[in-house]
Amino acid sequence: MRLALLWALGLLGAGSPLPSWPLPNIGGTEEQQAESEKAPREPLEPQVLQDDLPISLKKVLQTSLPEPLRIKLELDGDSHILELLQNRELVPGRPTLVWYQPDGTRVVSEGHTLENCCYQGRVRGYAGSWVSICTCSGLRGLVVLTPERSYTLEQGPGDLQGPPIISRIQDLHLPGHTCALSWRESVHTQKPPEHPLGQRHIRRRRDVVTETKTVELVIVADHSEAQKYRDFQHLLNRTLEVALLLDTFFRPLNVRVALVGLEAWTQRDLVEISPNPAVTLENFLHWRRAHLLPRLPHDSAQLVTGTSFSGPTVGMAIQNSICSPDFSGGVNMDHSTSILGVASSIAHELGHSLGLDHDLPGNSCPCPGPAPAKTCIMEASTDFLPGLNFSNCSRRALEKALLDGMGSCLFERLPSLPPMAAFCGNMFVEPGEQCDCGFLDDCVDPCCDSLTCQLRPGAQCASDGPCCQNCQLRPSGWQCRPTRGDCDLPEFCPGDSSQCPPDVSLGDGEPCAGGQAVCMHGRCASYAQQCQSLWGPGAQPAAPLCLQTANTRGNAFGSCGRNPSGSYVSCTPRDAICGQLQCQTGRTQPLLGSIRDLLWETIDVNGTELNCSWVHLDLGSDVAQPLLTLPGTACGPGLVCIDHRCQRVDLLGAQECRSKCHGHGVCDSNRHCYCEEGWAPPDCTTQLKATSSLTTGLLLSLLVLLVLVMLGASYWYRARLHQRLCQLKGPTCQYRAAQSGPSERPGPPQRALLARGTKQASALSFPAPPSRPLPPDPVSKRLQAELADRPNPPTRPLPADPVVRSPKSQGPAKPPPPRKPLPADPQGRCPSGDLPGPGAGIPPLVVPSRPAPPPPTVSSLYL
């Protein structure tokens, strides 16, 4: 077997062998299709650098596929080095491959171990560059140096071993094409909001916009597509190359694409493939729901057909349908041998499923791209250049859809492709590694050592998930993903991982919006909310009779949608509310599209005239559907809209599922009980005895407060007790109140004042007795006599003069006698003996707490 076949996923380990018989070629060969896309190309022999030594790429592929790969490539005469790493998230775990034998028997090859042959990376020396290349069958992919310099790499027709054919994207002349949305559009997108990204007044603990999402993708190749390739191996190679570009396109939006399965209708088509894309989409979605989804769980399925659709349409999908079991899919025409053209078309349809609308014309949705015709992936039509990037409008639309509750199935982390050998720096945590943040130049994780792929000292986790903060695991129960609407449920950290658990929502049929709707696929929208999303704040549902009259007519102003042939379908009176949206008031112009026609009509209701107005919205030439009511909208007591028909809500099984929760919980999207606080899963029958952390915190706070109050009361009681004891003991009390500063030394005691002041002093303070003799009084007695207030005249005779003591027993030295006689006793003193007021400038008298010193030798101070 040729070398290319050995490596073009030769690549397969365990599992059933892939079909290798030649397939009849009824759709035209790759060589024939390439004739219509001729453009200036240049062959080139790439080289692989190992230890800075150039080795032939062909020689490297004969041995093994290294995980880090450096390729030396010449572009426009200049040598460039591509620094690449294997994309290990492209094929998670073991994908499912399906094909059919000649007798119609389906062959399912599960558990294949694919050797990873797809790489992503950058060009050395070019900031903002990116590379997406597969080596499954030669060297194929895309190299973007700058927005103005982008190249595609393709293998020549029939030559899988030769050098790749390199073309500038500007030299690719693809046929003009457009996209048509199906009439079953399930959400109403808006024009870009005026506020820039990141300025919404919504606080999130972990922004769902920045959290990585993963789309589990299944690609189905119809019979005409399968006939273009010699065997299943070649078809698988091309599918991997397309899926790699899809992942590259969506990666800047924090959305990863993982190929979980490939099915090829190798013998015949399993549904009718019509030139009308609406018919093909309708048939494919019915087959997906009934046959594909039960045996191969996934988020989105994309049909690739070799049949040409009528007109310029190359694809069709349903707006905002991701995660829906009924509508999450699209159909795509393989209109080019270039993988870039096909991948860009599939990315466009997958973008519609994610809630992305067509970009507005003009410069309102800027997008970097090759000059002069800078095109974005979500443009309604591209005449020449395929889009390589999503515009700012697409980013805002995805943000709005996520915050509205879309995409609950996208938050599940999938197992990556098993590694051939652990390699530190590939950004995948492998056996023996605690973390992997890439090479030294790329690593921005402060918790991870990029040289050893081990956590730094003291770190518990790598900061690659919302449950890790400052290199420490968040506690179990910390909310890592808040609710995003009435039908969403919060997620909490497990306590032993940095990753947030998969997103779950309320189960289908659980009531929301105050009973005006029920949850469907994790979303809730009442009729009023849908009107406001189309006509702005203040819009309300039209009068019931106006609504019923319009939708039962089945025309452009009102219907229950279109059938695959394009004609309008009238609603029955019972189903009228589940048909086209009929609103009143609000804006004069809708937020989506424009008014093509306006119809006014007066209806007689039991003799009363009712004025009704209906509009025919122009949503663009490539969008051929009215805006219909969302599934889950209430249409009567116990009735909701399902498949645009008013049906009983119990068909959704919510009540049956809720009965398993025994009245203490509700059902989630996995049909499990989400128990109320205080009740334990799985059936909410066991009441938790442990108090919550909040209750525990409150009890501890009250206990601390009680201890502080008791300590304060004890201190106050002790102080009062001491004061009472001092009052009882009098001058001998050993306790005194705190003083702000040293007390002034009092003058000599006056007998009259001493008798009168003792009572006053006892009420003021009680200084402690001195522990040693006091020093001599530094203030002269003459000055004391001048400053002291005169006492009242004595009321009884003075005592006899004291006996003069010897000098040894005398106290302080006798002060000099006054120079002049003291004044006579003043008249008119206050008989009460009160001290002068503060205006006299005389300090108040302080009575000493120690015994008075011996009196002077004179018998009176007034002599």
Curated annotation (Swiss-Prot):
Q: Where is the signal peptide?
A: 1-17
Q: Which terms does the record give in the GO molecular function aspect?
A: immunoglobulin receptor binding; integrin binding; metal ion binding; metalloendopeptidase activity; metallopeptidase activity; SH3 domain binding
Q: Biased composition, Pro residues: where in the chain?
A: 767-778, 791-800, 813-824
Q: Where does Zn(2+) bind?
A: C179, H348, H352, H358
Instruction: Check the record and name the InterPro entries matching this protein.
Output: ADAM_Cys-rich, Disintegrin_dom, Disintegrin_dom_sf, EGF-like_dom, MetalloPept_cat_dom_sf, Peptidase_M12B, Peptidase_M12B_N, Reprolysin_adamalysin
Glycan-carrying positions: N237, N389, N392, N606, N611
Cysteine disulfide partners in this protein: C323-C409, C365-C393, C367-C376, C480-C500, C657-C667, C661-C673, C675-C684
Tell me the PROSITE patterns matching this sequence.
Answer: ADAM_MEPRO, DISINTEGRIN_2, EGF_2, EGF_3, ZINC_PROTEASE
PTM comment? The precursor is cleaved by a furin endopeptidase. Phosphorylation increases association with PTKs.
Entry keyword set: Angiogenesis, Cell adhesion, Cell junction, Cell projection, Cilium, Cleavage on pair of basic residues, Collagen degradation, Cytoplasmic vesicle, Disulfide bond, EGF-like domain, Flagellum, Glycoprotein, Hydrolase, Membrane, Metal-binding, Metalloprotease, Phosphoprotein, Protease, SH3-binding, Signal, Transmembrane, Transmembrane helix, Zinc, Zymogen
Phosphotyrosine PTM sites in chain numbering: Y715, Y735
Cofactor field: Zn(2+)
**Region ranges (Disordered):** 22-45, 736-863
Enumerate the Gene Ontology biological process terms.
Answer: angiogenesis; cardiac epithelial to mesenchymal transition; cell-matrix adhesion; cellular response to phorbol 13-acetate 12-myristate; collagen catabolic process; extracellular matrix disassembly; immune response to tumor cell; innate immune response
Write down the superkingdom of origin: Eukaryota
Domain EGF-like: from-to ranges = 657-685
Subcellular localization, as worded in the UniProt entry: Endomembrane system; Cell junction, Adherens junction; Cell projection, Cilium, Flagellum; Cytoplasmic vesicle, Secretory vesicle, Acrosome
Q: Which residues lie on this side of the membrane: Extracellular?
A: 207-696
Instruction: Please give the function described in this protein's UniProt entry.
Output: Active metalloproteinase with gelatinolytic and collagenolytic activity. Plays a role in the wound healing process. Mediates both heterotypic intraepithelial cell/T-cell interactions and homotypic T-cell aggregation. Inhibits beta-1 integrin-mediated cell adhesion and migration of airway smooth muscle cells. Suppresses cell motility on or towards fibronectin possibly by driving alpha-v/beta-1 integrin (ITAGV-ITGB1) cell surface expression via ERK1/2 inactivation. Cleaves E-cadherin in response to growth factor deprivation. Plays a role in glomerular cell migration.
The record ties this protein, via PANTHER family, to: ADAM A DISINTEGRIN AND METALLOPROTEASE DOMAIN, DISINTEGRIN AND METALLOPROTEINASE DOMAIN-CONTAINING PROTEIN 15
Q: How does it assemble?
A: Interacts with ITAGV-ITGB3 (vitronectin receptor). Interacts with SH3GL2 and SNX9; this interaction occurs preferentially with ADAM15 precursor, rather than the processed form, suggesting it occurs in a secretory pathway compartment prior to the medial Golgi. Interacts with ITAG9-ITGB1. Interacts specifically with Src family protein-tyrosine kinases (PTKs). Interacts with SH3PXD2A. Interacts with ITAGV-ITGB1. Interacts with GRB2, HCK, ITSN1, ITSN2, LYN, MAPK1, MAPK3, NCF1, NCK1, nephrocystin, PTK6, SNX33, LCK and SRC.
Protein name in the entry: Disintegrin and metalloproteinase domain-containing protein 15
